């Protein structure tokens, strides 16, 4: 293992502008931001075992982890700083804060993100498909939605009652499947986005009431209705394209 592991770090560059304007006798705020983040020295775990000739990949092949070539003392896993990511995001936000005079507030935020990573890991540190990160190239970041829209609103219904709602919409997130259709020794990591254009959607509603006890003490009761329309957000896809002459029908 690497006995001189580094602390992972990120460099972030941001540029934004915020404005206030009047619309419908109300004060609104708009935000536009561009953010670029590069992360370095993430912790990775890769296989240290090699074939009898010292190679990681099979002769003439571009794929094939040497799992069956354990030395007499067992399997070797190497811990290093090879994980890197980079992402560029655009944030558009429109906000009308709640005020006692208007009795309502609203917020709308849209985020576009272009993310890349140099491993096939999904929140973990494993890098077992290749001998090092240089073989992966830049793959779409897993778990990051390219498009995300969040809308929220609150309204004072009177008599101490407050009603609110929140809507979240996300595009389908990338997954990195294994494609061995070209041969068992020439598999590739083949990114794809499952399902339709919307990968996640949820609408939540809430109602609350505040009670004044006539002293310095107040208490509030709140009821939440989560995922109002019982939308199904699927997960756990089959990330296997198939092998030579045997494509995955799914």
Stretch-by-stretch model annotation:
Residues 11, 28, 35, 236-237, ...:
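Extracytoplasmic low-complexity repetitive segments enriched in small/polar residues
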Residues 1-23, 75-89:
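Outer-membrane beta-barrel signature, preferentially recognizing the C-terminal barrel domain
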